[in-house]
Amino acid sequence: MNDAALAPDVSAALERGLQAQSLDAAFAAPLLRYLALLVRWNKTYNLTAVRDPREMVTRHLLDSLAMQPYIASGTLADLGTGPGLPGIPLAITRPQLQVTLVESNGKKARFMREALRHLELGNARVAESRAEALDEPAAYDHLTARALDTLAGIIAVGGHLLRPGGSLLAMKGVYPHEEIAALPAGWTVGEVHPLQVPGLEGERHLVVVRKG
């Protein structure tokens, strides 16, 4: 399947969402190419439980891009990225960002390598590894995690990757009061941003945790 094989309402939904998120319409083409590849591979390899391309636009692409305004340039490790979410959409829309896609599942890692080749995305690479086994201490300015664990759990497996003063950006649903209260020593919440994801009902928050 190429992006032309996606239904017109899929591309229209993405274009509306990009406009609502104040992102350049030119990003629609590479995002649709990524989406078409994900839809095709998902039929065989079960990369995501979301099967409908229109739903993927909202729950995968636009949800991932909701954190984009809060990420500066630099280096970013996306922990437990699955098929590349949010890392690949962020790499597409932030070409000055160097993204490492951390995923231990072999079929998901293979898919991401093919996606990076297909998209000619030179600012992203795949690390086929569990986050806790990745031997790159203090190598990253930012960590992201979209659906991995509690804040403390994310820090336990990936905190060593973040440089002092760096930030963990964790996507959450409702405001995570208990998770914030359980942060380990040396980690503090910088900001919590309520997010609006076009087409997605329910609360979404981006928790920015800083490493002391």
UniProtKB/Swiss-Prot annotation:
Enzyme class: transferase
Keywords from the named record: Cytoplasm, Methyltransferase, rRNA processing, S-adenosyl-L-methionine, Transferase
UniProt key word Cytoplasm: yes
Gene Ontology cellular component list: cytosol
Residues reported in the UniProt entry to bind S-adenosyl-L-methionine: G80, L85, A131, E132, R146
Domain of life: Bacteria
Listed GO MF terms: rRNA (guanine-N7-)-methyltransferase activity
Catalytically driven reaction(s): guanosine(527) in 16S rRNA + S-adenosyl-L-methionine = N(7)-methylguanosine(527) in 16S rRNA + S-adenosyl-L-homocysteine
InterPro entries, per the entry: rRNA_ssu_MeTfrase_G, SAM-dependent_MTases_sf
CDD domains: AdoMet_MTases
EC number annotated for this UniProt entry: 2.1.1.170
Record-linked NCBIfam families: rsmG_gidB (TIGR00138)
Role played: Specifically methylates the N7 position of guanine in position 527 of 16S rRNA.
Family affiliation: Belongs to the methyltransferase superfamily. RNA methyltransferase RsmG family.
HAMAP family (UniProt xref): 16SrRNA_methyltr_G
Name of the protein in question: Ribosomal RNA small subunit methyltransferase G
Organism in which the protein naturally occurs: Xanthomonas euvesicatoria pv. vesicatoria (strain 85-10) (Xanthomonas campestris pv. vesicatoria)
